[in-house]
A protein has these predicted regions:
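Helix-turn-helix
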Residues: 1-31, 35
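Short coil/turn segments at alpha/beta junctions that flank glycine-rich nucleotide-binding fingerprints
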Residues: 1-4, 54, 75, 118
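Alpha-helical structural segments
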Residues: 14, 31-51, 59, 63-70, ...
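Hydrophobic alpha-helical connector segments
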Residues: 49-78, 126-133, 162
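All-alpha amphipathic helical-bundle segments outside canonical DNA-binding/catalytic cores
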Residues: 59, 95-99, 116-132, 160
Length: 175
């Protein structure tokens, strides 16, 4: 039904809770939606948080790519829900993006820049590298209908994507 088409009564029925019980914890449907989006953002940030400064830079970045692709495999609906919020201009999430995503993004781009400066990986703009990883992994979830039509009948689409992205980013990042 989507956000607009879903009522608190439907949420209560689906969750197995009474409407008054839900309203005890949440002020309304908007509050539930923002809470869900925040939980999704925390889940999506976990793979980025796991980039280790003391690991092999190329392998750390490739492992991040694979973790993002695995999230695409496991949580395609959640990816689309979060993407829809961003596509709408992040009306509910802008403060949370600034407080949660921005500091982590700045920290990890500084780490990647350190690896670039040390000559551990090729010269890249760390911000655009992260954007590229997001777009090339989440595409398979966010545009699942398109991928399904264009690769109809093929098994292992995400396995093929994993091998392709590994090769692409390895070539890009090898000094």
């Amino acid at each position: 039904h989507g956000y607009r088409g879903t009522t608190l009564d439907q949420i209560a029925e689906t969750s197995g809770l009474s409407k008054p019980n839900i309203l005890y914890y949440f002020s309304g449907k908007e509050d539930i939606h923002v809470s869900l989006l925040n939980q999704l953002m925390e889940s999506w940030l976990d793979p980025l948080e796991r980039l280790k400064p003391d690991g092999n830079p190329l392998e750390e970045i490739l492992a991040y790519v694979h973790r993002k692709l695995e999230m695409t495999r496991e949580f395609p609906r959640e990816s689309r829900l979060f993407a829809n919020e961003i596509l709408q201009g992040a009306p509910r999430m802008a403060p949370h993006l600034a407080a949660g995503l921005k500091p982590l993004f700045d920290d990890k781009t500084a780490l990647i820049q350190h690896w670039v400066d040390a000559g551990d990986i090729a010269t890249v703009d760390p911000r655009h590298l992260i954007f590229s990883i997001w777009s090339t992994t989440q595409h398979y979830a966010d545009f699942e209908a398109q991928v399904g039509v264009l690769m109809a009948g093929e098994d292992g689409v995400l396995d093929g994507a994993s091998a392709y992205l590994d090769n692409m980013f390895r070539k890009l990042l090898t000094p």
